[in-house]
Amino acid sequence: MPERYAGLVPTISAARVFRTGYHDYCGPSPCLIRCGLYAPVTLRQAEPVALAEITCDTWLTEDGDGVVQVQLTWVGQADTPYAVSLADAHGTIVADASGTTAHGRQRLSLSVHQPERWYPWTHGTPTCYTLTVRAEKEAVSRLVGFRQIDISDRLLFRVNGMPVRMWGANLMHLDTLTNCYAPEKMARILDLAQLANCNMLRVWGEADKLPEAFYEECDRRGILLWQDFFLGCSLYSEEEDQLSLYRQEAEMLLRTRKHHPCIALWCGGNELYLAQEYQHPEAPVYGEKIIREVFPEVCARLDPHRLYYPSSPCGGSFANDPQCGDTHGYTHLWFVPGRAYPHFLSENCRVSTPTWQSMNQMMTPDELWEEGTYALTAHHPCEI
């Protein structure tokens, strides 16, 4: 590592090792590092042809018509017939196209006259359309939706011209032991979020990467997502080989997720400026080139219709300025009274307890009641 990073950029950040937030007080215990296979691995045979990648962009014209631009990358035999269709929520085909496969990338566009629009569940119906590509034995589908999201400099949101006040939470880890994604567990969390009237969730830059199934579930439910890139609370190497890795990561995330109507914005990461101000106030913001040059270039090139936000929090005279941009409510973790309500609170902390079974095994009966309130937090300080 170059000498200029010494004492500033942690080795784990310079090596670009993915780890979740188990390393400090923000992360849930126990402190474990995953290893081995924790998600499905598949082997596909391209016979005679297979779809290596499908990316979709959707937008609304000034007249209110919908456009779906599709990019297909094939492997296998060229000149194989394929068909693309777009079905509405009732299964009716509203647009289609066909062609023959070719090596490299192919682009095509579908138009829909006055499509039903996608809304967050608190303000309307989250109408989704299904895009399907078929060729021989191959069939791949993607959920898409049509909506216009406008976000002002003061983080005021309008969806399809309608002002929408955002209420939400940050997503933590589903399983601290296996790191495996469990659809039924995530469905329960999303149920609870909606019971709490949340219409936005933040995919935290230090949390786990989530699969396609999660984004489709948010599409169907009408839950908006603030999507961080996976940087968090650290300074980062700006060497060219590292910048190339960050560029590849961003391109992969956008190509595989940008078609989801639930994603409201891309954010450069979690607390990069805040980490510098708290930990190394006199040092350069190493990693700023990633969030100010690399990520915005990728977003402008691959997803120009969606807002890019540099880092959370940022926007004021200092990173966590509650009067401008977004802010993280660290003082709320200790329930400080009289705190002025911030402008846009994108992260907040609350203390939770373990399950009753765990507490009953590890604590005395006296500790489980009101006079032992402090013991609860001392045994398990974590955030939800």
Model region roles, listed by residue range:
Residues 33-36, 266, 297-299, 334-384:
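Substrate-binding clefts and catalytic carboxylate motifs of secreted carbohydrate-active enzymes
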Residues 280-285, 323, 359-363:
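Short secondary-structure boundary/capping segments
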Residues 77, 273, 351-353:
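Short, acidic Gly/Pro/Ser/Thr-rich loop/turn segments
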